């Protein structure tokens, strides 16, 4: 009796760019030997819109509404880096009240970003219920953004060079406090529902492991880096905005696997709540209604008309010129280090505007992580990276 030859030639399979489990228009050209992944080549660029060239043909005031389309799950971070770069180059000071408002918007966006990661990630590994829960929480964040900026998800157009577009509306800080009190127990609910679920843990624990050295060598950032034991958070490292005024910890894990990245993001949401509560209590001038009452009571000589109680240093003219010089500035977005290299030549438009997107760099390690795993694990590992193709392709 002859023995049948079971080995076959490797098969090349395309995942995406229209596959429902792809996080945007990403295409993976995967080489398979049976169920085992031999090689993987990510193909990007399907959502390229020339954002850098658009920036180089717009004034800063004109470009801010565009930037929500880089990472459309975290538009506030895009706006922050877009105004931070000219501020630093032109040495524009930001009032403390405006800085506190910025921090509150950024931390709300961090929570919204992690929630939008959590739902689809769990859906990728087979847990459907949390996918619906996360939109319940995000809805409250949308309501806060809508009250302050007029827009709910993207295109808030709220940050300005030297501050923010408008002060917080009456009662906003009270609504923020209600959200913090309501959302804290919801994270505990996620922990009970997900973290110690034996099926979930067996599905992703030990999967897609990245060592500390690999994370550093691949220039990873954000939860991808901190889940491998590197306590690197730009809010602590660069001391930008007013983060030094608050008591909070950098969320880290040591294992470097998909489960560690999940735990880091959950802990980051808890730390963001800490920052939000402290910012709401410590904001210079307090709630807008109290600040305006103090100004009216004390008259024009009131200290509450001082620089630190303003929402913008000075209204930026449409003809604002970016000075000669160059710099690289960065913020800690929900996905990692979001940076901009800006080169000015004393003109209203930048000479060079280079975007350093966190998920673009983090996506580079995907082929390394996928070699040797099963086909079923591809989506779990990709989901743990947290990519938005608008940011990757720009």
UniProtKB/Swiss-Prot annotation:
Belongs to the complex I 49 kDa subunit family. Keywords: Membrane, NAD, NADP, Plastoquinone, Quinone, Thylakoid, Translocase, Transport. It is a peripheral membrane protein. Pfam families: Complex1_49kDa. This is NAD(P)H-quinone oxidoreductase subunit H. Signal peptide: none annotated. It is found in: Cellular thylakoid membrane.
């Amino acid at each position: 009796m002859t023995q049948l030859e079971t080995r076959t030639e490797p098969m090349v399979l395309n995942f995406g760019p229209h596959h429902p489990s792809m996080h945007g228009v990403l295409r993976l050209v995967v080489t398979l030997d049976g169920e085992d992944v031999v090689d993987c080549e990510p193909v990007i660029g399907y959502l390229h819109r020339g954002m850098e060239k658009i920036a180089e043909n717009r004034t800063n005031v004109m470009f801010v509404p565009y930037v929500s389309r880089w990472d459309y799950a975290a538009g506030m971070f895009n706006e922050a880096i877009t105004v931070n770069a000219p501020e630093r180059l032109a040495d524009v000071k930001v009032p403390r009240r405006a800085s506190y408002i910025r921090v509150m918007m950024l931390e709300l966006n961090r929570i919204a970003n992690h929630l939008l990661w959590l739902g689809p990630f769990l859906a990728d590994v087979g847990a459907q219920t949390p996918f619906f829960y996360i939109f319940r929480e995000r809805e409250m964040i949308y309501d806060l953004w809508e009250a302050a900026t007029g827009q709910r998800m993207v295109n808030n157009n709220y940050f300005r060079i030297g501050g923010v577009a408008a002060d917080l509306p009456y009662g906003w800080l009270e609504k923020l406090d209600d959200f913090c009190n309501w959302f804290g127990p919801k994270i505990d609910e996620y922990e009970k529902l997900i973290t110690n679920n034996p099926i979930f843990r067996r599905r992703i624990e030990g999967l897609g492991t990245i060592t500390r050295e690999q994370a550093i060598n691949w220039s990873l950032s954000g939860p991808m880096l901190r889940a491998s034991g590197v306590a690197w958070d730009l809010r602590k490292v660069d001391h930008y905005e007013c983060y030094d005024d608050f008591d909070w910890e950098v969320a880290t894990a040591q294992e470097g696997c998909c489960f560690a990245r999940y735990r880091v993001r959950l802990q980051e949401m808890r730390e963001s709540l800490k920052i939000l509560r402290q910012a709401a209590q410590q904001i210079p001038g307090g709630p807008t209604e109290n600040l305006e009452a103090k100004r009216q009571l004390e008259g024009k000589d009131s200290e509450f008309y001082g620089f630190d109680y303003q929402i913008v240093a000075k209204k930026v003219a449409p003809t604002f010129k970016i000075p000669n010089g160059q710099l690289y500035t960065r913020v800690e977005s929900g996905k990692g280090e979001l940076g901009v290299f800006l080169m000015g030549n004393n003109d209203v438009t930048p000479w060079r505007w280079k975007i350093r997107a966190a998920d673009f760099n983090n996506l580079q390690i995907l082929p390394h992580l996928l070699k040797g795993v099963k086909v079923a694990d591809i989506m779990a590992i990709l989901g743990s990276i947290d990519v938005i193709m608008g940011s990757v392709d720009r």
